[in-house]
Curated annotation (Swiss-Prot):
Keywords linked to the UniProt accession: Amino-acid biosynthesis, Dioxygenase, Iron, Metal-binding, Methionine biosynthesis, Nickel, Oxidoreductase
Positions that bind Fe(2+): 102, 104, 108, 146
Protein's name according to its UniProt entry: Acireductone dioxygenase 2
Function: Catalyzes 2 different reactions between oxygen and the acireductone 1,2-dihydroxy-3-keto-5-methylthiopentene (DHK-MTPene) depending upon the metal bound in the active site. Fe-containing acireductone dioxygenase (Fe-ARD) produces formate and 2-keto-4-methylthiobutyrate (KMTB), the alpha-ketoacid precursor of methionine in the methionine recycle pathway. Ni-containing acireductone dioxygenase (Ni-ARD) produces methylthiopropionate, carbon monoxide and formate, and does not lie on the methionine recycle pathway.
Amino acid sequence: MTLLQVMAADDAARVRLRTTEEAAIAAELAAHGITFDRWPVLDDAAALSSDDLLAHYADRIAALNADGRYRHIDVARIHPDDADPQWPQTARAARTKFLDEHRHAEDEVRFFAAGRGCFYLHLGAEVLAVVCEGGDLMSVPAGTLHWFDMGERPDFIAVRFFEEADGWVGDFTGDRISAGFPTLDDLLTAP
C-alpha cells in the first residue's frame, strides 16, 4: 500500500497526516514540487529481464523523458535470497547506503515496478515519509534533503532515471535526523 506520513522534523511523534489515499498523497507532494504518479504493474515483473521490463514500459519512459534529459535509465533489483549465506550482509549494506540524510545534484526519479521502499523528504519543518510500492513513480527534485529505507528484507524492482551516470551518488549532510524517524518496517506495522 502506498502511504504518506507527514511528521514534524523535530518530533516524529507529531504526525500531521497519515493517508493511503492516492489523490491526497499526490496533492500533498505536488504542493512541494514533487511528482507522484501511478503506472500499471506487471504481475510477473520479477520474472522479466531488465531489458524486457524497460521494453514493456518503453512508451511511458519515452513520455517521461520526452526532453531527453535522462541519458541513463536502468533497473535496480534486490530480492531476498535465503539460500545465499551472504545475502543478509549484502542486504544490510545496500540498506545502510542511503539511510542517512543526503541530497542529489539532479532529480531522483524512480518507478517501482514491484516491491516497496520509503523516501523520507526533509522539507523545512516537516519530514514526509512516502512508502512507494509497485506502480508508484516519484520524482524528488534536485537538492531535496532526503533519505531512503528499503526495509529489513529489501525486495523491490525500480526503474531509475539519471541525467548523468553518477547521478545516484549522494551528497551526505552529516545530520543524523533519520535515526529519529520510524523505519519503513515501523511505518508498515503502525496502526
